[in-house]
Amino acid sequence: MLKTYQIIGCSAGVPTQERGVSSVMISTSNFDMMIDCGEGTYLRWQKAGYEWKNLKFILITHMHPDHTGGLIPFLFYRKLFSIEHTLTLIGPPQLETFITDGFQNSGLSNDQNYSWIDISQNPELNLQAGVKIRTMKMKHKIPCWGYRIEDSSKSLVFITDTLATSNAVELAQNSDVLIHEATFTHDMREKAAEHFHTTNIQAMEIADKARVKRLVLTHFSPRLSDGIIQEWIWEGQPCVIFDERQEI
């Protein structure tokens, strides 16, 4: 059963003193999963109180460094703790080579117990305890996938690094929680389109069309101050949540 989510990192491109780059934790009754693992994720994950024994899945949306830069260090720390249970890594076809080469180029053995799933070949997956994943491709400069995670009663959708697209609306349809990128404010929508990103207003329009229950925005340009993004409201609720676990 899906229980909680937490934004571990919400900065786009580069971390700031206050915001880490992209990572989200989702907790179920039986296990935890991580979506994206930007630079510095391990420290924020540890401070948030998560434990190795519960982490069973890491999902990667795409291979840009602000979404993968913390992954090899994270897996290295896992190796140092001698964690024995299988960790399933789900993501683009390049993910396995990225990790294998990262360990090899560092002179480290990659002898942990991993399983690999290429998301381009497996758009729908059954995980554990009735939790399922469905994915759809988004519109970014490189291949990027959105994730819908659901059980028999709840659903959470994570969409990042994309133009506003009908696939986002379809994937998020009637979800309990939509976590969507909002790299730019709407007055910079031409720049957002140039860089294949979404504005805050476009994300809200996607939430409206998809009839989601709760919208949470993430992946903010470092140029946007906390004061600006904390003013964003959708359906009477704040769209920005920092460093707190939330019920799905």
Regions found by a protein language model. Name each.
Residues 15-17, 120-186:
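Active-site-proximal loop/helix segment associated with metal-binding centers of metalloenzymes
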Residues 4, 86-88, 176, 213-214:
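Residues at the starts of beta-strands that form the adenosine-phosphate
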Residues 34-38, 56-66, 92, 156-162, ...:
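Active-site neighborhood of phospho(di)ester-bond hydrolases with catalytic His/Asp-centered motifs
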Residues 163-245:
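Cap/insert and terminal regions of metallo-dependent hydrolase folds
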Residues 1-48, 144-160, 177:
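Conserved beta-strand hairpin/beta-sheet module of binuclear metal-dependent hydrolase folds
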Residues 40-90, 118:
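Active-site metal-binding motif and surrounding structural segment of the metallo-beta-lactamase
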Residues 70-77, 102, 225-232:
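Metal-dependent catalytic neighborhoods of phosphoester/phosphodiester hydrolases
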Residues 87, 92-144, 241-243:
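Metallo-beta-lactamase
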